[in-house]
Amino acid sequence: MDFDFKAHIEDKPIEGFQSNILVLIIGLLGMFIFPNIVAIAIGMFLPQDFDLVFWSYIAQLVGYGLYVAILFLFIGKDRIINILKGFISGRNIKTAVIFAFFAYFGSMLINMIVTMLFGAPDSNANQDSLNSSFLTHPGLVVLLAVIFAPIVEELVFRYSIFRPLAKKNKVLAYIITMLGFAGIHFVSSVSVLLMELDDPATSSTAITTFLEDLKTLPVYLVGAFVLTLAYDANGNIATSILTHAFYNASQVLLMFISMYLLEDLTNSSSVIESFTNLFEYIKLLI
């Protein structure tokens, strides 16, 4: 299929205040409620020694899929086709690559500034969870981080929140979207803080850990800004989904290199053995 780099495909608007509110509610349910409902339903049929991490990812993937299905049923065939056309628009793909580049190097720059001012930030609880899961279930992490999360998060924050708000006040739309997007990446951090805050033995450590996690907030805000800018540039949700997917793919690749390849290059007795190990890890992802 030929890509038309000059094609400009904008999302078809959803008319009416109530309809836009309903789209937002569906999005919030899809992000926070549906995966938990699926997890409870699955848990009723699993043995006590089930793999918690594996089934947690399955529940999240199924919950996200349920959200997308419900949203698409609500917005209708014409809008779905319009969104799908955006994924084969050369203009959108080109824009996504450019903005993913800006997101990656912008995050690096902000991270360097934060490190110089406050010391090197540790990865937050959300990132720690991804890192540990990648060791045991790399395929599921890739599926969630590179495909499902970009689709769901962009539909919620750029399509359901930024798009209608920008018609009223674009600056406010940027602020709310950025804060909301960055905030969801601290749900794990806040959960840990709240669980340990009442215990005098752990409260001090919990607060220190949470404050350390907050050092990563500027990085998420930069990512949120670039993703919102990507959507705003073309007015098509496919652009920000692709940008998000490309950016997350680069992060997963770096995680793979840091966890596996660099360790193998250090521990292996030859370059051939290093690449043999690399191919073995690639098999785990397929």
Question: Predicted segment positions?
Answer:
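N-terminal, membrane-interfacial amphipathic/helix-forming hydrophobic leader that caps
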Residues: 1-121, 190-195, 217, 246-286
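Membrane-interface segments at the starts/ends of alpha-helical transmembrane spans
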Residues: 46-59, 131-135, 203-215
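Generic signal for short, ordered secondary-structure residues
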Residues: 76, 89, 93, 134-135, ...
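Generic alpha-helical secondary structure signal
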Residues: 91, 124-128, 214
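Transmembrane helix-loop-helix hairpins at the membrane interface
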Residues: 108, 136-286
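Hydrophobic alpha-helical transmembrane segments and immediately flanking/interface helices
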Residues: 121-135, 139
